Amino acid sequence: SDVCSSDLWKMTRDDEIRYAEEHNIPVEAKIKSPYSTDENLWGRSIECGILEDPWAEPPEEVYKWTKNAQDAPDEPEYIEIHFEKGIPVAMNDEEMDGVTLINTLNARGGKHGVGRIDHLENRLVGIKSREIYESSAAVILHTAHRALEGMIMTKDALRFKDIISAHYADLIYNGLWFSAFHQDLVAYVLSSQRLMKGTIRVKLSKGTCTVVGRKSPLSLYSEKLATYQKEDSFDHGASLGFIKIYGLPVKIQAQKQMDVLAGRGALHLDSIMPPKVKSL
């Protein structure tokens, strides 16, 4: 027998469900609940059915891993995640392997309604598709890891990392894991994470994951430089010279190009302002 794509049969979702029922193929989808779901360690995705209407609120029945935020515990839960070279290795001072940590966070986050995502994603072929996700561990770890990077990385490094992250995500989504480009991006990511050591504390409550504490031996944050109290060690006298130097390009531009910038003989700012919207 040959194996081919089911697309060649031109079957609708209902046709596929009926075929599965007639041939005793176990599937979760039913005619009255025709959702297409996928699950793995990292999360659960749901699509099809009423979800194809972008205006329709997802019915509660589509969710299996996460509680409705309204039904989540009133008491928040605090979790500390420790990272070494950007990799989460412990939770609440207990060392865990990756699989155990992710499973634990999925359970903890799901109990508090954390990890529900409803969005339109752009498929490789250009079609927009509405997807519902339940990914508690992913949301918690991403939130915590981002907070750690914000404490250790410089501003420019953070901005560039965002660019690389977008390319990395697209590459994996588009099935190019085994490409040379992926190897290049991996080299950068691994290098960027060599300093990412520290602990982040998050609060899980009613569908939210909020960073409430952070510490790292490699942090660039200095309380003595940032404080507004008498312990302030920043030399405020240095500000005057910095302001003059930093503002010099804008000052020269205003002197040399004032007529154009003021709108005489060139495009006026009013012409690029958005139109006024009438009341609905």
Residue ranges and their predicted role:
Residues 2-5:
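Short, small-residue-biased leader/transition segments that mark boundaries at the very start
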Residues 13-25:
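Metal-dependent de-N-acetylase/amidase catalytic core
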Residues 28, 34-86:
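A conserved mid-domain beta-alpha-beta active-site/ligand-binding segment of alpha/beta enzyme cores
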